[in-house]
Amino acid sequence: NDSSAVYVGMKMGSPSVNHGHMDVGSFLLEADGVLWGMDMGGEEYNRLETRGVELWNSRQNSQRWDVYRYNNFAHNTLSFNHKYQDVKGKAQIDGYSDQENNMYVISDLTPVYKDQVKSAKRAVSLVDKEYVVVEDVIEATKRFTMMTWTMVTPASAKIVADNVMLLEKDG
């Protein structure tokens, strides 16, 4: 109930579960009562079904994944060469710490990026209960691999330096 606390959570699992999204590796982040990294949620099923979208097909080439809110491009996770996560892949908790000054979780995301990268691992840490570190360790399979790091936020973003953005929301 501390309004000044920092909260972070990371999603593992598989896109192929019932009502699943391609959000494996995604994180949520709230600090000082402000939501910084968010999940947009799903689309209203009836609205999509009346437009002919085949929602309940969860195969890799399904129309379901063309719905923006259901694919990895709309979540706080990674994308490689603008491809979808592999629906047959599954990630789990591979390591964690619940020590008060360095809480973290680690997951090998490689199974959801099959044939896209050799290895993709993500660690999300809450350090000293004050700040969050998202660390990705990627080993590419090709000489050129385009990686996209996405964070969905309701905040306004301003580029302040090379590779540095300032997020502002609620003062």
Protein language model features and the residues they cover:
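Extended polysaccharide-engagement surfaces of secreted carbohydrate-active enzymes
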Residues: 1-171
